[in-house]
A protein has these predicted regions:
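Active-site metal-binding loops of divalent metal-dependent hydrolases
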Residues: 56, 152-153
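Generic preference for hydrophobic
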Residues: 71, 122-123, 199, 251
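Conserved N-terminal catalytic core of the sugar/cofactor nucleotidyltransferase
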Residues: 2-4, 11-15, 19-27, 31-51, ...
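A short, conserved acidic/glycine-rich loop-to-beta-strand motif
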Residues: 169-179
Length: 278
């Protein structure tokens, strides 16, 4: 949530600030001042992250007959703990888990998060709410820039670099984009520079606008929550197209590790190839 303030500055300082305004990465004087203050305060990453862990994991059966996706093992720890490791690498320790299916097991295992070096709160879904609905429920906890991550993927992303792009672009949402050889199985990003114009769903390989796909990792501003309809809602279908039309949706291509563990075949591939967060 942004508030209007009035500043009185030396004219020479203002000249230096204005010299950095280019209309692209730095939109205007207000934007330039915000970036300078963030840098001075060391606010180089969001302070809070949401992990979406409410799904049933039907494609991971029989494993998920007994345990939720959030607790499936990867290299001696749960899938979710690898996300904790990524966040802690950037000193992000205020984490919210959106839980639904088998939520009691998840909450019993992670409790308040102190055993894992984090502070953990929960958004409880009494019915499936999709990838966007839980954010509506957690609105009161999400009052400044925040991260959202799917809970069934392993990823290694430079969050500091991504956040810098997000702020410089004056984005309402920035999507981390990963590269795949065959984009025909995914929604593929069409971009103009860093701005996402649209996602083309499962194009023929030769007709794909790029090889960049949604990695299930986002940085958002609280204003995004006001665009989410009540009840079941998907970021991909109900929110991102609105942001793209507004010109406020951006993409951050990254080359780090990314594994989707959403089915047995992909999970087994991740077990073999994933390198733990250092």
């Amino acid at each position: 949530m942004k508030e209007r303030v009035t500043l009185t500055l030396d004219s020479n300082i203002l000249k230096k600030i204005d010299s950095g305004v280019n209309g692209f990465k730095i939109k205007n004087r207000s934007h330039a001042v915000e970036l300078l203050i963030m840098k001075a305060l060391g606010a180089n990453v969001p302070k809070k992250a949401v992990i979406l862990a409410g799904g049933k994991g039907t494609r991971l059966r029989p494993i998920t007959y007994e345990i939720p996706k959030a607790l499936i093992p990867v290299h001696g720890k749960t899938l979710t703990e690898h996300l904790f490791d990524l966040f802690k690498k950037y000193d992000i320790k205020d984490i919210i888990m959106a839980v639904g299916h088998m939520k009691e097991k998840i909450e019993e295992h992670f409790a308040d998060g102190s055993r894992f070096g984090i502070k953990l709160n929960y958004i409880e879904e009494n019915e499936p709410l999709g990838t966007a609905g839980p954010l509506k429920l957690g609105k009161n906890m999400l009052t400044e820039s925040f991260i959202v991550s799917n809970g069934d993927e392993l990823k290694d992303i430079n969050i500091e670099e991504m956040y810098q792009l997000h702020k410089e672009s004056n984005a309402l949402a920035t999507i981390a984009l990963t590269t795949v050889e065959d984009p025909s199985k995914y929604g593929v990003a069409r971009l103009s520079g860093s701005k996402i114009l649209e996602f083309v769903e499962k194009p023929k390989k030769e007709e794909a606008p790029s090889k960049l796909i949604n990695s299930g990792f986002y940085i958002m501003e609280p204003e995004v929550i006001d665009l989410i309809p009540k009840g079941f809602a998907m970021l991909e279908k109900d929110v991102f197209p609105k942001l793209a039309k507004m010109g406020r949706l951006f993409g951050y291509p990254f080359s780090g590790q990314w594994f989707d563990t959403g089915n047995i075949e992909r999970y087994e591939k991740a077990l073999k190839e994933w390198k733990d967060i250092k």
